[in-house]
């Protein structure tokens, strides 16, 4: 798939100088190639119609972009029964929210989400900061202090951790399964000093990686407090938002909140014929229905 560098350069220029930019001729995965080529500094949030389309987009971007820069922000699955899938949604949501809160100027971060995930209330920023447990190799921290913070953040003490929201104490070790990571952490102490921090496999108990510090997040996937915050409340002012169309979400709760951010619309709405739209002129992939003769003719 060939994408004109002139169109990408024009898009980058418009993004720097306009509050909203309209595109035309962008189809399917070509959109995510454009996102990967834009090389934008800051947070980019891609809002798609539903969970399935957002998951597919995130999967494409994982392959297109190197490093841990892509985050999927799903809903909390609060109406689902307890399961590994619901637990996975909570981890991904907390991880994405945590990354937004930890964002440092100059980073490149992409968050993929959808309306129902944006409209769920999250804890207020102050409450999140108060329940965040930061641990660093070499610092002095008492067992009791750590256990008290974990209990107050809703963590459950168990014999062996197996899922997010659990911790275990064994001798000079504390195992903690954070809500923002797919594997638990093993904190090793020498007296009251943190001697080492290891990421380990909960099934095999084998160490996977040694790290120098860790941020242990409680469950940020939703909030029981109706007066909590929205995800849009914690986004930096220079966030760049991608959406399908300006017409698609205009009646949704979150849409008006997005007016304070720069926006890229990946479709030119019927209500607007903008001669200044960035045109990519990419044709949608034909449907061949396993007819290889048609496929051969198309390639030729």
Task: Kindly give the residue locations of the regions a language model identified.
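ASCE RecA-like P-loop NTPase motor cores
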Residues: 1-300
